[in-house]
Design a protein with these regions (language model features):
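Short, charge-rich amphipathic segments
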Residues: 2-20, 113, 118-130
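Glycine-rich N-terminal segment of FAD-binding domains in flavoprotein oxidoreductases
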Residues: 3-92
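FAD-binding subdomain of flavoenzyme oxidoreductases
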Residues: 94-141
Length: 141
């Protein structure tokens, strides 16, 4: 589950490898709701095409989501089963993505009591700076 080698991932690999070879920076961007943080330079690697809930096991409290999935879509899916995440990330109304929320770690005031979103991530599949697919963790049941 998670990241399969689809056309989007292959295109990202080519973009990453091209940037690496040319020495050009890349900036990973979903909805762009956090573009005002820091200095955003480089060609955009857009995650919005990599969306969707890959799997959802409500009885196990486990969901696998792609990085470009809007946070609001994840919340709606969980809400259908009377489930929720204990986070209130900013910029949801502007289309914040799951990848952006996890990457920024901005999960709202409840963090003091429930922890950060990264404390709830069981695993991740990602591409490194060489365009290699790396897999960390996984589902625990």
């Amino acid at each position: 589950m998670g990241v399969e080698m689809n056309d989007t991932v292959k295109a990202w690999q080519a973009q990453i490898r091209g940037a690496q070879a040319s020495g050009k920076p890349l900036r990973i961007r979903g909805a762009g709701t956090k573009d005002f943080y820091g200095t955003c330079v480089g060609d955009v690697l857009d995650t919005r095409a990599h969306t969707g809930i890959v799997s959802y096991e409500p009885t196990e409290l486990v969901v696998t989501v792609r990085a470009g999935t809007p946070w609001a879509e994840l919340v709606r899916t969980l809400d259908e089963r009377q489930q929720c995440l204990p986070f209130e990330p900013p910029f949801v109304a502007q289309g914040a993505t799951v990848g952006g929320v996890v990457n920024a770690g901005l999960t709202g005031a409840a963090r003091l009591y429930v922890g950060g979103i990264r404390d709830y991530v069981l695993g991740a599949h990602l591409l490194n700076a060489q365009g290699e697919l790396l897999k960390f963790g996984g589902q625990v049941m």
